A protein has these predicted regions:
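Catalytic cores of phosphodiester-bond hydrolases, prominently lipid phosphodiesterases
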Residues: 2-15, 20-33, 37-191
């Protein structure tokens, strides 16, 4: 018998959805992404500075719902599931102050965001304006980072890498429309 594996779905630019966070959460996606700016002392969510709205805070759209759900679900993302949730935080403004503000906010809820406190905690992955690998240690250990394909990480730095990103166009010219043809599947090693 073959064990059933969950399909890992990522909600890219989740804040653009009709119901940010909730729409993806209801589908039990594996990963939700929010683009975050530190703007006027607040962590705001949006794709560009001109898109920012004072009511679209990272705390209100993502952190508070997660804190509520973890309280309701016995310390896990979904009450009847052992699956973990990943929250990708794409830093869109200056790395250090933005990440410090994110860490300060998440640090108020270790039972939700720190796997050392709760093994079922949300996995936090920082992408976008990722700090230099030498600076990873400045941030709490529960914050992990999106790595780059050609970086030369030390073993300690590699421990902080959650995933490695690469430009898809380096491997295939498929534009995502229609079915992928056999040549592109072969190029990706998926046939």
């Amino acid at each position: 018998a073959v064990a059933e594996r969950p399909i890992l779905i990522h909600s890219h630019n989740d804040y653009c959805r009709r119901a940010p966070f909730w729409q993806a959460y209801a589908q039990q996606v594996y990963s939700i992404e929010a683009d975050v700016f530190l703007h006027g002392g607040k962590l705001l969510v949006g794709h560009e500075v001109e898109d920012l709205s004072p009511g679209m805070t990272f705390e209100a759209l993502y952190v508070e719902p997660l804190v509520t759900l973890f309280g309701r679900n016995g310390g896990r993302a979904w009450k009847d599931s052992g699956e973990h949730l990943q929250l990708m935080v794409e830093l869109k403004s200056a790395t250090e102050p933005t990440l410090q503000a994110v860490a300060a906010l998440l640090g108020r809820y270790p039972e939700v965001f720190d796997p050392a406190v709760n093994p079922e905690a949300v996995r936090i992955v920082v992408t976008g304006r990722v700090p230099a690998p030498a600076d990873f240690g400045k941030y709490p250990s529960y914050i992990r980072f999106d790595g780059v394909w050609d970086a030369d990480y030390t073993p300690a730095q590699l421990e902080r890498i959650a995933l490695i990103s690469a430009d898809f166009s380096d491997y295939s010219q498929w534009n995502g429309k229609g079915s992928i043809d056999i040549d592109h599947l072969n190029a990706l090693g998926l046939s």
